[in-house]
Every structure is written in C-alpha cells, then in structure tokens.
Regions:
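Positively charged n-region of N-terminal signal peptides that target proteins for export
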Residues: 1-4
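M16 family metallopeptidases and their MPP-like homologs
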Residues: 40, 45-61, 67-69, 85-178, ...
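A conserved hydrophobic secondary-structure block that centers on an alpha-helix together
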Residues: 237-249, 582
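Bacterial N-terminal signal peptides
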Residues: 7-16
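Hydrophobic, small-residue-rich alpha-helical packing segments that form membrane-like cores
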Residues: 187-192, 209, 223-234, 240, ...
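Proteolytic maturation boundary segments
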Residues: 20-39, 265-303, 309, 315, ...
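A common structural junction motif
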Residues: 178-185, 277-284, 393-404, 631-639, ...
C-alpha cells in the first residue's frame, strides 16, 4: 500500500511539472472588439494551422429554418464585396434581386410559380457569375500554399481552417479577416444543390440513419434532435435573407476565436492580428433559449437495415458541468478499449461489441451505452436484446453499486497520465483542446489541471457520480439487421442551367493581395540519419528513433508475411487481440489486459496482405515486464471457446449479409473491376477453414509468421543495448517477399461495369485508366497533375462537376502510385451524385478525360501548393522510421522534398500537359457504376461511349453463401 501511495505521489508531482512544461508557447488574450485569440507555438510542427471558430451552430437556428448554420459554412467561401468582385456596382442589384426572389420563392406554394421563380433565380445567378469570381478566395489561398482548406459545422460551433507556411502569416490573416467583412453569398442556388447532394450522401448510409433516429428520440424537443444539415423540407425551401440575418447575428468578433498553432512567433504575429481581425465590429449577442430535457423512459425498436445494436440512454450533463471530468472517467471505467468492465465482456466474446461514452453538449447531454449482440453461427441468429441487456446491465450495476476495483481505477488513472504526457506530441491535439475550450467557455487553464484532478479522484467521488447518473431512468433503443432499408427522403434534381463564369478573371482584390508583404519561406528537410538502422541478425533490422519528448515508447514488430501467403493469419491476429496465456491456471484474456494496463502498456495485433504486426506501447522503465508478458502470450496464447465462436459468428454474419449491404456491394464492385477473380471477396479463405480454427492452430500461425524477416520500429528513451535483449527475436528468420501487390485487370477498350441497386439514394461513379510503371522520376509531374485535377475547389474536376454544375458534393481524379517502383500506376476518378444526374456526370467527366481543360494561369499557385506540400511532409517523431523506410523502398536516398525541389522550381504547364497526354489522353476508360437503374439511361451511356454496358449482380461479386451453410451443418 505504501508503495502504491508513493507511486501515486510521484505521478502527481510529475504531472504538476508537465503542466508548466505543456503550457510553454501558449498565449491567450482578447482584442478590443472581443475576439478571443489563442496562439500556441510548436516549433516541431512542419507548418502553421489557423482556425476561425464561431460559437454558433445548428442549435442556434430558428426551428422553421433549419440547416442555416451549415448553409452558411458553404457560402462563406464565395467572397465579399471585394473578394470575388469584378464589378460590385453592377453585381449588387443582381444580388439584391436574388435575395428578394428567394423571399418570394419561400412564400410561394404553387409549384408552377415556384418553378418560374427558380428559373428567374437561375437567370440572375448566371448573370452574376459573369461579373464575379467565386474562385477568388481559393486562388488566393492556393497562392500562399495553403493546404487542407475546409470548414465544418456542428450543433454548437462552426469552424473554418487550413494550414499554411509561417512566412505567409500576414496574407493569411488578411484574407481570413477580409472574408468576414461584407460577405456576398454568390451562387447560392448552385451551392444549395451541393448541399442536397451532401444530404443524399448521408441518406445513403444506414449508420447515419441509425444515428439520426437515435438523436431524434433522446433529444426530443431540442434542436439537438435534428441533423446538423437540416430538415429536407427546409432545405427545399431556402430563404437567403434568413441566412444573411443568421450571419449578422452570430458572426461577430465577441462570439468568435482566432486560434493559431504551429511553427511561428507569437510576438511578431500579435500586431498583424490587431491590424486585420481588429477591424471586425462587435455586436450584442441575443440570449439563447433553453429547452426542457425529454424524459428518458421506455423502449423503442427500428428496422433500418443496420447491424443489430441496442442503446441504453441516461440523462447526462452539459459541457463544463462540475461533474463532467468525473463522469467521463466513469465511462472509461466501463469502456477504454482495454480494461473497462465492458472491455472485459468484449474480450470474453459475450457480446460482439459494447461501449459507453458521454455525449456532452452546450445545452444538454446524454450518457450512452451501446452493444452489438453476440451472433451464434450454429443458430444463425443474434442473441436476443433481452439477453444482451442482461450482460451489459450486470456491468452497469457494478458501477451503480460502487463495486469498482482499485486496480481498475489505478489503470484508468495511469491511462490519463500517459495521454497527458503525450499531449504535446501533435499540434492537432493542441488545436482540438483549444477549440473545445473556446466553444464551451472553459478556462484554458483547465486543460493543464484536468489530469491532476483526475489523479486526485477518490473512490468515493467516483462512486457518487456513477450512482447519480446511472441510477436515473433510461431509454432503450434497438435497431435490427433487417436489410429492407427504410428509404429516407431524398432531394430531387432541379431544372437549373449550369453557371458559366468568366475564365481567368482577376479581381482588384487579387491584384492587391499579391502585393502584400510576406516573409521568407523557411526550408527544412527530413534527415534520414534521425533514424538509426542496425542489423540484429539475418533478416532482422532495427529502426531506432530517440524520443526527446517523454518516457513513452512505441514498438512495432513487422514480420514479412501477410494474408496473401497465410490466408488465416488475419483471423489469428484478431483472436490474439483477446488472448490470454496458457498455464495452470491459465491467464484469461481480460486478466492479461489488466496486467498489461497496470504496467501502463497496450498491445495490439494486425495483419494485411503483406505484413503481420505487433504494436506495443508503454513506459520505458517497464519495458522488461511488458515484454515478458507479451513473449509469454506469443508463445502460449490462451483462447476460450466463446472467443473462437464469437469470431466465427461475426464472420459468418458478415459474409451472409454482405450481398444486401450497399456499402459492401460498392467495395466488392471496385474489387471486381480492379482485380477480377482475384477480388478480396472472391479469392478469400474458405469459411470452413475459419470454422475449424482452434487455439492450437492460432498458436501455430503466430509462430510461423514470426519466422519471417522482421523489421523493428522503436521510438523511446532506452539505449539500443538495453532495448535489444527485450525483443522477442529468434534465429533463422526466412526472407520476405513483401510487400505484395495484386496485379490489376488490364482494360484495352472502353468498358462499363454497372451494378444496379434500386435502394441507393446516391450513385457511386468511378473512372479507371491503366497507367505506366511507377518511377520516382515522375513524382513531381504526377503530383502537379493531381494538384491541377483535384487540388480542392480550383481543381479541374471539382470545379467542373461541383462549382459550375452542382452535380456532386464529392468528386476527384488522381494518378495513383503503388508501393513499389516498377508496378503500374493508375488513374482513379470519382463522382458521388444522384442517379438522375449520372448521365450528365459521365458526359462532363469524359469531356475532362478526353480533352483536359487548359489553364496555365494556375501554375504559380500550383507550384506554391507543391512546395508547401513538400515542406509539410514531415513525419511525426513516432512515424519517422516507417516513413523513411517507405521512401527508401520507393527509391529515395534523401528527403523527397529536397530531391524534388529543383524539379518543382523548373515545372512548366507543358509538363502537366505532357503527363496528361502520356498517361490519360486517348487511353481506354473503364467506368464503374452503382446506382438506381430506373433513373440511369443505360442506352445513352452505350451510345456516348460506343460500348455495351455490362450489368453485374451481387452474385457475380461474392462467393455463394451455400458454403457457409455447409460449414455449420
């Protein structure tokens, strides 16, 4: 006991030291206009990430106009009275007319009048497109080398973000503040179509539909009950004036934050922020309404074509509540992916899966426990909801009664401490906690004291909070495996003409922006010598990366054999995830997990076509004890029959039901198109072989895999001479043939493969072209082509498909390179669109492939993007070794960004054209399509492409289910 208390005291002291260390580089202040500014320097980051966060989301919308927050997120990329304006004086009357027409459209009920108004809006939009440039904002961001330009909307916030080089700080601050001054919501009608496509995309997903139904029930009477994207009846009846009103109400500096994380200097940045964001005008915010919380009682059941799942939902709490940290800790006692009470149930195989989490929001919250029932392959049925509930409630009752072991509490506290130690490793983690703190009004200091509070939690306090929330009434909601999907509403294709904007139009804003001052781009390169490579014997290589941040190690053992040579190995790896250790008595899997967790460690297994992986993490001081346990598990894995049965049942159900699941059908269609009879769904291990697996076979498979060439990737603080004796090395390792790359089907003429599916709400349309053998000498040209084709909204594909024609929410086209030089590259394009737009989408995409639109004015911005991408290709400390090994396998003996720098500087638009002509132009195109046959004109496709459409059935893409029945009989 004294030893435990001493360890706990040392842990708290080390956390207090880390708190001061973790704060380093963080600055928090407010501008005079009320804008919150959070700056966090991280000089290990490859670039800078900037966020503008608005404390407003779907929850702040009027009930009669849902979807406004998300609409606004889309529209705030369209420019202002300066950005994107070619002639604002001429444009303004047209813009005002569009606003007025939408008011009339929203009020009208006669379909004919609405159609006439929609036509008028379309005509005005086309006129406006001739005197404006919605690409202006994206062009400027491309010019400064911005990457990941995007935004997202949730219930409680909206955020706009991207990364950029520190040298472009002033120009980034300028355009990100300018976008908030007098915004103009151009092409509103066209962008609505893109939102419709996004809505249809979610309607296509049974998982999204299950979540939608769950939220409707557990947040009844609150804005949280509806999707962020909005209700379909409101999406079809927009009012632009209400969007402007929403913007004017909530997008004010005293309701916003500017958050910057990365490699920059805060002191030199502050004056720039004051000059740019200080221009925004504050405004008094309206009071937010409160909503009564629904009584959570009773049971509900739905058929959604979704895997059987049961949810038990309890009243939770709001973000920032005094109990929040403790209740989240309680959830981790139930489920943390390793040692929680529900984790132990999962490990034993009593259920297919179970987990618990706290869904805390600004105005309300829920405590949610979910489970997927055990599937019995012999009975060919899932265990009943009642039986599943009994298993889960047994564990919840332990929490309610305060029957929580000291070891479990200590393990979860240790997990928190480790997460806190690793907190400073990634800039994205820093950004996420700052966004969360601002959104919910939490003191930033809480970030650094939360873990200290967790370490000081008493068992009595944990029990008090657990009883308080889990003793409340709860609602039970279940979904079953009925694959007769509920068909949600979809939004129809409108009759509007595509926009035809002025090409290469340059605004006054763009000309002025290019003249703004910028710093000197700092060039830093990866040094392969950061990773020490040593031979530990024949076919055994150590890749050693020192950890200079903390005492947490990561160790990956990669054996050179995978599913291709050992088809049952992935299943053995899955079983090892829950294995214990043979003995007298045997150590069960749940007890193995507990012992590993007590050492502050985690172990996982994985397998792909080429490799078998063992991944281990923990504290270096415990390396010997951790590896002792892992070695024993590897040599003598112990599996209970229920664990074997659970894996077999899950695989049986997966194979039995997959022909009816649209997401799996799409995957199988692509596999068939690319690999033919070698598709992963056809060339798969027979189920009878899985059915006959036992613990002895698992032991043999793991032992056999460990005889292949081994790469050891270590990041930690132990010196090599202390590390090597702990590794599970064996002699006589055989050479590896990995990585394995399956040869793809070669198409020598135009081909269309069509999988008809009347249940899909959105069609999936792919374009495939066989390529040439890969050589790193063509990397710059390939990257330039990909940037030109799919570099965000200025890329040819998205611009033609989405921006101009509103055919799809998602569209791209890229040249894909393999993992090995000499293997063939290939082009893959994609459009996700409504089935009634498929014919038009094929025509537009084929025009792009047949005669790629030429726009040499993009070259400057394109090269800036390539340089920035090269500069930010900096692997994290823990991924350096694997990344460098991959680059060397491709043929690089130095950092690719250094090797390719001169080629990027010398790049011309002719190089992009030549790459297109050599690899795309005139090559046979294979179209791969899944959609509703009632809405797709197959004859028109055949006429346009000059080839027959090959219709496929699910039976062609999957093996027969008869072998499943034969195995279990």
């Amino acid at each position: 006991m004294r030893k435990y208390l001493l360890s706990a005291l040392l842990l708290v002291c080390s956390i207090a030291f880390l708190s001061a260390q973790s704060r380093e580089g963080l600055t928090e202040y407010k501008l005079e206009n009320g804008l919150t500014v959070l700056l966090w320097e991280d000089h290990d980051a490859p670039d800078v990430t900037g966020y503008v966060v608005v404390r407003a989301g779907a929850v702040d919308e009027p009930a009669e106009y849902t979807g406004l927050a998300h609409y606004l997120e889309h529209m705030l990329f369209k420019g202002t009275q300066r950005i994107g304006a070619l002639d604002w004086e001429k444009e303004k009357p047209i813009y005002d007319s569009i606003i007025a027409l939408y008011d009339q459209y929203s009020d009208a009920t006669d379909p004919k009048i609405r159609e006439q108004l929609a036509t008028q809006i379309n005509e005005c939009s086309m006129r406006e497109a001739k005197i404006s440039s919605t690409e202006d904002f994206f062009n400027m961001l491309d010019l400064i080398g911005a990457e990941g330009v995007n935004a997202f909307t949730s219930y409680d916030l909206t955020a706009y973000h991207n990364s950029f080089p520190a040298a472009e700080m002033y120009r980034w601050l300028t355009i990100f503040s300018d976008r908030l001054i007098n915004p103009v919501f151009r092409t509103f009608q066209a962008e609505l179509e893109n939102v419709f496509e996004e809505y249809n995309m979610y309607a296509n997903n049974p998982s999204s539909q299950a979540q939608k139904q769950l939220m409707e029930d557990i947040y009844k009477g609150s804005p949280y009950e509806r999707d962020v994207i909005g209700l379909p009846e409101h999406l079809k009846n927009p009012r632009l004036s209400r969007l402007i009103e929403f913007y004017n109400t909530w997008y004010v500096p005293n309701n916003m934050a500017l958050i910057i994380v990365g490699d920059f200097d805060s002191e030199s940045t502050k004056p720039m922020i004051a000059e740019t964001f200080g221009r925004l005008q504050p405004k008094e915010l309206p009071s937010r309404p409160s909503y009564p919380s629904v009584q959570l009682t009773g049971k509900k059941h739905y058929n959604l074509g979704y895997n059987p799942q049961v949810a038990w939902v309890y009243p939770g709490l709001k973000e920032g509540d005094a109990d929040q940290d403790v209740l989240e800790f309680v959830c981790n006692l139930l489920y943390n992916g390793q040692t929680g009470l529900l984790d132990q149930v999962n490990t034993k195989g009593d259920v297919s899966a179970s987990y618990a989490f706290l869904d805390a929001r600004r105005n309300d919250g829920r405590l949610i426990v979910m489970a997927v029932p055990y599937y019995d392959a012999n009975q060919q049925m899932f265990e009943s909801d009642k039986a599943t509930e009994a298993i889960v409630m047994k564990e919840i009752d332990k929490i309610k009664r305060g029957e929580i072991s000291d070891d479990l509490i200590a393990n979860v506290k240790h997990m928190y401490a480790q997460q806190y130690k690793a907190f400073n490793e990634t800039p994205s983690t820093k950004m996420n906690v700052l966004v969360d703190a601002f959104t919910y009004g939490k003191p930033v200091d809480d970030i650094f004291t939360a873990n200290e509070k967790i370490q000081s939690l008493t068992k009595e306090e944990i029990a008090r909070v657990a009883k308080k929330y889990f003793n409340a009434d709860h609602m039970t909601i279940s979904f079953d495996e009925d694959t007769k999907n509920m068909k949600p509403k979809t939004l129809p294709k409108p009759n509007i003409k595509p926009l035809d904007p002025v090409k290469n139009a340059k605004t006054e804003y763009a000309e002025a922006f290019q003249k703004l001052p910028k710093g000197e781009l700092k060039q830093t390169f990866n040094d392969f010598n950061d990773v020490k490579i040593s031979s530990l014997g024949e076919n055994v290589t150590l890749h050693y990366t020192p950890n200079n941040k903390n005492d947490i190690f990561t160790l990956t053992l990669r054996y050179g054999v995978g599913e291709h040579e050992m088809p049952l190995l992935p299943y053995a790896a899955m079983l090892m995830e829950n294995a214990g250790i043979m003995g007298n008595p045997a150590l069960e899997g749940k007890d193995f997990d507990q012992q590993i967790a007590q050492l502050g460690a985690a172990v996982s297994y994985g397998c792909n076509d080429s490799y078998f992986y063992i991944s281990i993490s923990g504290e270096d001081e415990n390396m010997n004890k951790i590896m002792n346990l892992v070695n024993r598990q590897l040599l003598m894995p112990y599996l209970e029959q229920k664990q074997l049965d659970a894996l077999k049942g899950n695989e049986f159900f997966s194979r039995y039901s997959r022909q009816k699941r649209t997401a799996v059908q799409k995957s199988a269609l692509m596999q068939y198109a690319l690999y033919g009879k070698k598709s992963a769904y056809l060339d798969e291990v027979k189920f009878i072989d899985i059915w006959n697996m036992d613990g002895v076979q698992v032991q043999r498979l793991i032992a056999s895999a460990r005889t292949y060439a081994l790469d050891v990737f270590y990041c930690g603080t132990l010196p090599e001479d202390k590390l090597v004796p702990e590794l599970p090395l064996t002699e006589g390792m055989q050479p590896s043939k990995s990585p394995f790359l399956q040869d793809r089907v070669t198409y020598d003429k135009p081909t269309v493969l069509f999988l008809p599916n009347s249940n899909v709400q959105q069609a999936d349309l792919y374009f495939y072209i066989n390529g040439r053998p890969y050589d790193i000498a063509s990397d710059v040209q390939s990257d330039a082509f990909n940037q030109y084709m799919s570099g965000g909204f200025t890329g040819i594909v998205l611009n033609e498909i989405r921006v101009k024609r509103s055919m799809a929410y998602s569209a791209y086209g890229v040249n894909t390179t393999p993992e090995l030089p000499g293997k063939d590259c290939y082009f893959i394009g994609y459009v996700g669109t409504q089935s009634d737009k498929v014919n038009d989408a094929i025509s537009v995409y084929m025009d792009i492939l047949t005669d790629m639109p030429k726009d040499s004015t993009q070259l400057v911005a394109l090269k800036a993007a390539l340089k920035q991408a090269a500069q930010t290709a900096k692997p994290s400390m823990r991924s350096k070794a694997a990344t460098y090994e991959y680059w060397q396998r491709l043929g690089y003996n130095d950092d690719p960004s250094k090797v390719n720098a001169a080629a990027i500087d010398a790049l011309t638009f002719n190089d992009i054209e030549k790459f297109y002509e050599d690899n795309i132009k005139g090559k046979p195109v294979t179209i791969i399509l899944m959609g509703d046959p009632k809405k797709i004109d197959v004859k028109a496709i055949e006429k346009e492409l000059g080839c027959k459409v090959t219709k496929l059935s699910p039976a062609k893409l999957f093996n027969s289910t008869q072998e499943l029945m034969d195995a279990v009989m």
